[in-house]
């Protein structure tokens, strides 16, 4: 059960945010188009700034420490492991052109930015969740991406889907999914993850994978033959044959889905403390993008 949080101002909460998701969401949202005075499409960048201001103003979220991570570019070491893994291919050029711009906008807001190249934004989020969890009351991972569920830890590390207004802790995840957060990479190896280009194994769906991992936790522990299984998903004989024939593929897919939790992040927890929006840089950013209405939007300014 999610802990009932009260006296927000007394809590130390670290929000780690999937900036790439925020950028894509803003680009494809119905919000009005916006072009910077220089002529480039700035809709997504302005959208992310508006989204972050809403978060910073949300009394229920009560942000005290914050970092936002971006894939820049959308390519990592995983592309060297598997040709089909997600990449920049197919990203609209007007969106791709905003990858650097949105990071600059986040700096203007006073947020710590984790710009990932060799690793992915998700790896930075996972690293932050592991590294700082024991120093704060709660780490809140802001993304709907299902692979981040592997980071859940009691109600100390939770996942927040702002769009659905849903917060998931470890107990909720176990109750609804039927397996442990540590099994998430194994689950994605079996079922696939279209967003990341992981194909999964033919025939495995949510129900069969959940049953098996609820019983065995990891791929290596699943017996080779179905008659030895303690659970009986539909089509067990064929599933066992598929897993036996494609076990190496499954192990590769699991490696792709396993977050790196040792990304070299330079910041201490104190570096992540949100102390307000720096007025000069933010107002200059607003002027450069022609969004003067946002100049007075922040409710908390950083002391000079």
Q: Can you describe what each PLM-predicted range is?
A:
Residues 60-64, 164-304:
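Non-catalytic nucleic-acid-binding/docking modules located in mid-to-C-terminal regions
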Residues 9-142, 146-166, 250-252, 258-266, ...:
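Noncatalytic, basic helical substrate-engagement surface that gates or grips nucleic-acid strands
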Residues 1-2:
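Short hydrophobic transmembrane-like helices used for membrane targeting/insertion
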């Amino acid at each position: 059960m999610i802990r009932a949080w009260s006296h927000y101002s007394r809590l130390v909460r670290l929000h780690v945010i999937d900036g790439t998701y925020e950028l894509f969401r803003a680009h494809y949202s119905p919000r009005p188009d916006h072009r910077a005075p220089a002529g480039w499409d700035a809709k997504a960048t302005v959208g992310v700034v508006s989204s972050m201001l809403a978060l910073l103003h949300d009394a229920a979220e009560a942000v005290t420490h914050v970092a936002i991570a971006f894939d820049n570019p959308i390519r990592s070491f995983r592309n060297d492991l598997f040709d089909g893994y997600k990449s920049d291919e197919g990203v609209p050029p007007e969106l791709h052109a905003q990858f650097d711009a949105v990071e600059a906008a986040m700096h203007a807001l006073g947020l710590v930015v984790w710009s990932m190249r060799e690793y992915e934004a998700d790896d930075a989020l996972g690293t932050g969740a592991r590294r700082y969890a024991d120093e704060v009351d709660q780490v809140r991972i802001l993304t709907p991406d299902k692979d981040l569920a592997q980071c859940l830890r009691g109600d100390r590390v939770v996942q927040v889907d702002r769009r659905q207004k849903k917060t998931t802790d470890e107990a909720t995840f176990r109750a609804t999914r039927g397996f442990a957060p540590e099994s998430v990479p194994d689950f994605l190896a079996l079922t696939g993850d279209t967003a990341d280009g992981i194909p999964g194994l033919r025939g495995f769906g949510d129900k069969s994978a959940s049953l098996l991992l609820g019983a065995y936790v990891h791929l290596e522990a699943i017996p080779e033959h179905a008659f030895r299984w303690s659970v009986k998903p539909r089509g067990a004989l064929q599933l066992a044959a598929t897993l036996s024939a494609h076990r190496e593929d499954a192990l590769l897919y699991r490696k792709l889905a396993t977050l790196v939790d040792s990304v070299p992040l330079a910041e201490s927890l104190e570096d992540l403390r949100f102390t307000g929006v720096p007025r000069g840089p933010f107002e200059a950013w607003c002027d450069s993008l022609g969004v003067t209405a946002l100049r007075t939007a922040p409710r908390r300014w950083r002391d000079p």
